[in-house]
Amino acid sequence: MKVITGGVTAAKGFQAASTAAGIKYQGRTDMAMVYSEKPCVAAGTFTTNIVKAAPVKWNQEIVYKHPSAQVIVCNSGIANACTGEEGFSYCRATAKAAAETLNVDENSVLVASTGVIGMQLPIEKLSDGVKAMAPKLKGTLEAGNEAAKAIMTTDTVEKEVAVEIEIGGKTVTIGGMCKGSGMIHPNMCTMLGFVTTDVCISKQLLQEALSQDVKDTYNMVSVDGDTSTNDTVLLLANGMAENPEINEKNEDYQKFCEALNYINTTLAKKIAGDGEGATALFEVKIIGAESKEQAVTLSKSVVTSSLTKAAIYGHDANWGRILCAMGYSGAQFDPEKVDLYFESKAGKIQIIENGVAVDYSEEEATKILSEEAVTAIADIKMGDCTATAWGCDLTYDYVKINADYRS
């Protein structure tokens, strides 16, 4: 596997465009379009929140009931959530505008929104934005990067990644972009992820690959414990790499899954590290677990703990907060067998052995916790299973950003 520069336009046949439609933000781009020269098999995973935004419902219809997709249109600023039938009609109107402009099937157009809940979209601006983007579609890396910028809300940086692998003697490329900074606790940010690939693969296996991978990537991220109404990951495969079709779980499928995991893990960590007001990526590894489920429950409990996140911001080795978060997680373990370590590029230090603090250097611990990426490793000594969750520290700026979000 080779990591390359790029995002959604890295794979063959994919183009992107962006525009400033003035939907809510002024003086910046706020709409993005991704287009494939050929129809794609599509896969998707969506929020588990009972309150689902209109675009989520629209995309579920397209992904699950139609054979192909070819376009993604995304706006930032307004979420189109809790907007009733009118909100759903705006999804249809957006798809219709894209279909007419690009000469594709209306049922091949996926739509996504992120922003403030409860506001209706200005449909004229949305339609005008679609028409403005279509002639600007390009397959350049710059076009993909600009699209990644257009879907940002409180994000501080665009998020994209791409890789190349070889399948059946052909070069296969996978690229992706995402946005997410606050309201991140997906269980399928607002968390939106768009991944494109030129691999030739069956629709069923594409969906299986994505559904399985999301469990270990995006679903292991928590910035603030809030599960958005709009969480969506879409994966399009147009087959233009011309590899032999992957239609069984063979070596080629595993190779594709490994590359997809790299894409999604990288994007998930970028979301966690760019949490609203964050100064550090906080990673929690549970090792020695009896089951995967136990490890997942424990790691997510720690990474979601506000007190632990505040301690990470203060570079404070307050291990009691970690043990406490593990204790109320609902997972069973023996606290008197837990070993705990902190690790960063500044080094690694043991804090607890068999549930009791060791004689460690507070100065050394603070040094390790002062880096931009910090890992807590808890060994519960019950088995061989592991899980890793990602989050960020909790800062004063998180409250400031969210107190002013609608203004």
Where would I find each of the regions flagged by the language model?
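A structural signal for small-residue-enriched, beta-sheet-centric alpha/beta enzyme cores
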Residues: 1-75, 79-89, 99-407
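Generic structural marker for isolated residues within well-ordered, non-membrane alpha-helices
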Residues: 95
